């Protein structure tokens, strides 16, 4: 029987709550025209990148703990493409062409293809270099100009004229994912502290085990509730 690291589930549950909270604020500010100056502040952007970055690392760890990354990658990428279709039809002004699910799906497929090669790299070296590369490349989108108009380059992280309401390009985020993949080998070996096996808040752990379905459903539900609310108060 595989060991379940409940603390990872709990951290993932906290992050998905923050994702939902962020999208509530996004809807209020960007769709319903609310005036929330703090939403566009540097502090808010850094906070968002912080909890999303934790999700990236956790996703990489999960890839080290399963052999079904090809199947998971295809399923996750399909979820991203579904979001593209739904936003194109229902909310073309908020079209998502390469969001977080597209990113996760691509990374899982890349990990499935390259995991044997990655396993030859020592954990500490791989994690350290991955974190370093994330910080070195995190402003790539703004630093490089004159890139050809290519969706592939846009997905990689270059400014090409394409746009996406939710945008998590391969570079720099893949390096946090890879850092998690390296750290995940410690979990796979069972060499992490026992605290990771504890389940102090089962409700949060449950949320963390169902992040995909929550992510797919939360925005339609949140948006629908807001439309109903604002129609009633008017």
Annotate each language-model stretch with its function.
Residues 1-234:
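Alpha-helical transmembrane segments and their immediate juxtamembrane cytosolic regions
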């Amino acid at each position: 029987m595989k060991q379940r690291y409940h603390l990872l589930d709990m951290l993932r549950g906290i992050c998905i709550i923050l994702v939902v909270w962020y999208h509530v604020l996004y809807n209020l500010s960007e769709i319903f025209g609310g005036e929330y100056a703090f939403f566009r502040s540097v502090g808010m952007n850094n906070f968002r990148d912080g909890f999303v970055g934790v999700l990236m690392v956790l996703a990489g760890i999960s890839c080290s703990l399963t052999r079904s990354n090809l199947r998971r990658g295809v399923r996750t990428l399909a979820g991203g493409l579904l979001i593209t279709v739904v936003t194109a039809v229902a909310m073309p002004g908020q079209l998502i062409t390469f969001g977080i699910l597209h990113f996760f799906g691509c990374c899982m497929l890349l990990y499935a293809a390259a995991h044997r090669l990655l396993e030859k790299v020592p954990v500490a070296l791989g994690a350290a270099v991955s974190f370093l590369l994330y910080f070195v490349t995190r402003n790539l989108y703004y630093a490089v100009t004159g890139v050809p108009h290519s969706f592939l380059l846009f997905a990689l992280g270059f400014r090409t004229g394409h746009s996406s309401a939710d945008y998590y390009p391969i570079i720099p985020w893949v390096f946090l994912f890879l850092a998690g993949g390296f750290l995940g080998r410690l979990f796979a070996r069972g060499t992490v502290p026992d605290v990771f096996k504890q389940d102090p808040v089962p409700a949060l752990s449950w949320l963390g085990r169902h992040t995909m379905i929550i992510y797919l459903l939360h925005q339609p539900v949140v948006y629908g509730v807001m439309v109903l609310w604002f129609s009633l108060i008017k």
